[in-house]
Amino acid sequence: MGNIRQTFIKRVARELFDRYPDQFTKDFEHNKKKVGELTNVTSKTIRNRIAGYITRLVRMKEEGKML
């Protein structure tokens, strides 16, 4: 079974991915730094979850599974 992410995390991740698609890669550590720069999220846990979901979105886009 997979993890179900909160709507807040999905919304913020999709907004960032739509605004800055060229700044994110398949590397989680890189995405984590970019999320920290582009948002005002102070919680490390929330930042990591957003970065993880963005990493997943990048992979889905490269595989052609994203709408």
From Swiss-Prot:
Answer yes or no on keyword Transmembrane helix: no
What's the protein name? Small ribosomal subunit protein eS17
Is the keyword Transcription assigned to this protein? no
The organism named in the record is Thermococcus onnurineus (strain NA1)
Q: Which domain of life is it from?
A: Archaea
The record, for Pfam families, names: Ribosomal_S17e
Q: Which UniProt keywords apply?
A: Ribonucleoprotein, Ribosomal protein
Which GO CC terms are listed, alphabetically? cytosol; ribonucleoprotein complex; ribosome
Q: Which GO terms describe its biological process?
A: translation
Q: Which family does it belong to?
A: Belongs to the eukaryotic ribosomal protein eS17 family.
Recorded GO terms, molecular function? structural constituent of ribosome
